Amino acid sequence: MAKLSPLFSSSSGNCFYYASGGSAVLVDAGVSCKQILTALAQRSIAPESICAVFITHSHDDHVRGLRVLLNRLKVPVLASAQTLQTLRQKQILTPEQGLDITRVQSLPLAFGVQLFATSHDCPGSGGYVFTPENGEKTAICTDLGEVTETVRRAILGCKTVVIESNHDVGMLQNGSYPYPLKQRILSSQGHLSNGCCATELPGLVRAGAREIVLAHLSKENNTPQLAEITAVSVLTENGLQRGSDYRLQVAPPSGGPVLYI
């Protein structure tokens, strides 16, 4: 049985924990090293059990604590070639640090790892699919302006899907963000709205998804209740019942539970 925990999930900072078969990894390090270590301790997870860190892309809310965390954990960090290049240019990584995701099989992990490209305004951005020995896949898919066919092919068939439900379009359009920022978020390389996220869910559940985690919610342009209602309403309209066909929860900004999946 695998374990998944959204340690941090919001526009302010992101970090996920995934473990299966005796191997444990982190996805992103968008808060301070101290916050990440505290979150692990709260879940009785030893930092020494982490064997790698996977990075989705180089935006600050996904890499803010990475440099210090790597100094503390002494583990490899993996990402796309473009992401690694950007992190070195930002001096978050040294020239010697960073392993291209194409070399992931060189690590002694108890599960497979696949990086898939996402549509986001950051070169080399992507999401991850983890495949344990029993074949029950987990996808982590946030920071995307649209669900492309590449993304859809990657996440269909996953038992557990972490998917972005970033904003309510009405709240964003009527909110205080500057117009250029609103346009960026709404673009095909921005962030996924509640409605766009919900549209994808029936297909995912019919393809075998049983655990849905809505993630990367905006604190300013969304609420957990609104994201949840939007998702469940669309699923219900498609004849899919919560509890019997799927389970769904919203990842909080911090303090998310450990899910046994």
Regions found by a protein language model. Name each.
Residues M1-R43, G126-D143, T160:
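Conserved beta-strand hairpin/beta-sheet module of binuclear metal-dependent hydrolase folds
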Residues R64-L73, Q89-K90, N222-I229:
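Metal-dependent catalytic neighborhoods of phosphoester/phosphodiester hydrolases
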Residues S5-C15, S58-R64, R88, V113-F116:
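Structured catalytic core of nucleotide-sugar glycosyltransferases
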Residues V27-G30, I50-S58, L78-A81, A139-T142, ...:
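Active-site neighborhood of phospho(di)ester-bond hydrolases with catalytic His/Asp-centered motifs
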Residues E149-V250:
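Cap/insert and terminal regions of metallo-dependent hydrolase folds
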Residues C33-A79:
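Active-site metal-binding motif and surrounding structural segment of the metallo-beta-lactamase
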Residues A81-E136:
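Metallo-beta-lactamase
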Residues H59-V63, L84-T86, C122-P123, V147-E149, ...:
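Active-site environment of divalent metal-dependent phosphoester hydrolases
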